[in-house]
């Protein structure tokens, strides 16, 4: 029996697998960074389990999260996506995915990779926290505030500080596995 972060106990196997295999693991791939930013934004106002359940649908609907392809989506394509039950059919969220794809390509152009830009907020090294209880883990940080502000300035949408902090946690910019969680130490060794 392993000890996990409380939020990953008594949940579906997909949720547990997400906690055990993905959450907090450093991501340096632009496509995966884009995927998580889109999924975190889609989750706004919903449960993460809803998004995990729709993840395959999102991958299919949004060209396997290839930002170059998503950036070329037409309004007609957006309208079609709004009829797709395999994703969250919220107009603002669907349209923001196209906007975010375009903005991420501009960031790639400026910084070399989208990942390098994102990782710049933590100087390229994951922040290692030592929270003992889930309730001690913050919803935002100075880094997420700064990144959120800059993303908004660059035209990204659905990137408030809470969403950005969740993105940072998911993609390993910050290791917020509680110290008693079996994933805390392994994630602390990752770069």
Question: What is each PLM-predicted segment?
Answer:
Residues 1-191:
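HhH-family (HhH-GPD) DNA N-glycosylase catalytic core used in base-excision repair
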């Amino acid at each position: 029996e392993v000890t996990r972060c409380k939020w990953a106990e008594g949940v579906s196997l997909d949720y547990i697998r997400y906690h055990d295999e993905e959450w907090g693991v450093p991501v340096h791939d632009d496509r995966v960074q884009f995927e998580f930013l889109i999924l975190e934004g889609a989750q706004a106002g919903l449960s993460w389990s809803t998004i995990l359940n729709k993840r395959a649908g999102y991958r299919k609907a949004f060209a396997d999260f290839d930002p170059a392809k998503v950036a070329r989506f037409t309004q007609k394509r957006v309208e079609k996506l709004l009829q797709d039950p395999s994703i969250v059919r919220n107009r603002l969220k669907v349209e923001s995915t196209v906007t975010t794809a375009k903005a991420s390509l501009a960031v790639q152009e400026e910084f070399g990779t989208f990942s390098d830009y994102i990782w710049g907020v933590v100087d390229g090294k994951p922040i290692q926290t030592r929270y003992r209880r889930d309730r001690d883990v913050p919803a935002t940080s100075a880094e997420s505030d700064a990144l959120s502000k800059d993303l908004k300035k660059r035209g990204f949408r659905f990137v408030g500080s809470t969403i950005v902090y969740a993105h940072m946690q998911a993609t390993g910019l910050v290791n917020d596995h509680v110290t008693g969680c079996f994933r805390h130490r392994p994630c602390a060794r990752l770069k």
